[in-house]
Amino acid sequence: DLGEGSVNFKWASEKLMANNKVIYRGQPVAAIAAIDRHVAEEAARKILVEYEVLDSVTNVVDAMKENAPIILEDLIGDDLGEKIHNTNMSEHIRHDFGDVEKSMEDSDHIFEGEFNMEMVHQGYIEPHNATAVWNEDDQIKIWTSTQGAFPARTQIAGILQVNVSQVKVTPLEIGGGFGGKIPVYFEPIAAILSKKSGRPVKMVMERTAIFETTGPTPGGKIKVKLGVNNDMKINSAISEIWFEAGANPGGMIGPAAMCIYAPYNIPNMRIDAWDILVNKPKIAAYRAPGS
């Protein structure tokens, strides 16, 4: 049990570097180490990549259509315990409390609403940066701007397929994060380049790359139906939450489903939430997971 550092390392590694198929705009396809930035940029310009343009989905409605392009062909979705293939739905969860149908019928007033959200980036001032050293004894030292040193260590070790004891992550003082600097992005790449070059490797992400490739808060759609009595107490609530996960599964539907009615004492509730893949970077926390 890896707790908050739990991650599917196969998908995590494919998030960092495209493998056969680019699944979101800006996804890295190659990495270069050089003695300085100018040499690296010159080498990068010499790399030619041929792309076959594929159909994409960029919102939860299009992603759930019957003939929608499938982002991850090997994804097996979990629909309330039922395994689903050939889908962009990673997970469907439900919370049930009380007798929702009867309480809704007994309510004096019914209110319904639909709320659509766009992805929003955290907008931290300091860019992502990391320095990695892969020593000859296979001990890996990484200095990085992160909000979660231990989750980062777990993810880096899993992606590099080394023991956690081989990885030391030193978190640096960060210039803003707001939840967006918990995932790892290029730390494992810096480590591999260090191993190949035999030198320390420093990487700093440009602002365009930050907006294109690092995790924003999820976009999505929420439907709400409330049964309210004449005394203005909420008697019944039904919600459907569709959240973008990005191009890899594992979004924020769990916290969202738990917290949507947290400020209220509602005796009868049904909350359904779906984790939906779209051709965007993997989402991350923004202020608080699921907020």
Language model: regions and residue ranges:
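Glycine-rich loop/linker segments at domain edges
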Residues: 6-12, 82-130, 221-291
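Beta-strand segments within the central parallel beta-sheet cores of soluble alpha/beta enzyme folds
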Residues: 165-172, 198-208, 235-240, 266
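Structural signal for hydrophobic packing residues in well-ordered secondary-structure cores
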Residues: 38, 44-55, 68, 97, ...
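Short, structured patches in soluble enzyme cores that scaffold and shape functional sites
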Residues: 115, 134-136, 144-146, 171-173, ...
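Alpha-helical support elements that line or immediately flank enzyme active sites
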Residues: 1, 30-51, 130-197, 243, ...
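Glycine-rich and small/hydrophobic secondary-structure elements
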Residues: 8-40, 180-230, 283-291
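Flexible, low-hydrophobicity surface segments
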Residues: 1-84, 110-113
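Acidic, glycine-rich active-site loops and adjacent beta-strand->loop/helix elements
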Residues: 146-149, 173-177, 205-215, 240-245, ...
